[in-house]
Amino acid sequence: AIFGLGDQVEYPESFVDGMGIIFCRLPFKQNVVGYTSTEGYKFYYSNAEKDGKFIGLAVDEDSQPELTPGRVKEWVAILKKEFI
């Protein structure tokens, strides 16, 4: 599972790109779990987006800090399902 911190307002063309960089270097990409929806985010491009989803949890404490607790809770629920 991968998570990343970014600022979609200041860096909409590279939002949470670090997640994508890590993902690309993994030898077993098919083992990555915890993909999340891109819904509710406003960005132009992200290396962390694959097939319309983020490859993990994208957190934006600069522009949407109020949404972080709910996003974390949803992500943990996804992870629990994928590991059980």
Can you annotate each of these PLM segments?
Residues 1-84:
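FMN-binding flavodoxin-like domain, especially the glycine-rich phosphate-binding loop
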